[in-house]
């Protein structure tokens, strides 16, 4: 399990930002100013849509100028492309199709919606050195971690930078 204070496991996943495909390495994204990892089961479930659209509407850069948000699910890039187009998601959605990254963060369901290994809804706020500053993992499928503590954790990154 990856807890607060731990160094987050590095990874590299294919992803999509808008219609631009690329490969995203966590260490590269974090080095630019911290990262929010937002794990979620799938693009088109109603709760995931609500969660990702809520994240879309947050002004992340007012907290931390070079902050990155990365959405991670087991959906394909094709599903991500459709979802991004329908909901104007401005941050990259990454495809963890084999569940390797989900398992390395220990945020997978055993079974959900008759599918093994889908990601739970989870947030990890990482600083520039990939240290986990905040972690929230939903225990129930209908639970969405609270945004208030998440925003506080992101704000605290700018305090760490000024020390």
Task: Please provide the spans of the model-predicted regions.
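Chalcogenol-based redox active-site neighborhoods
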Residues: 1-163
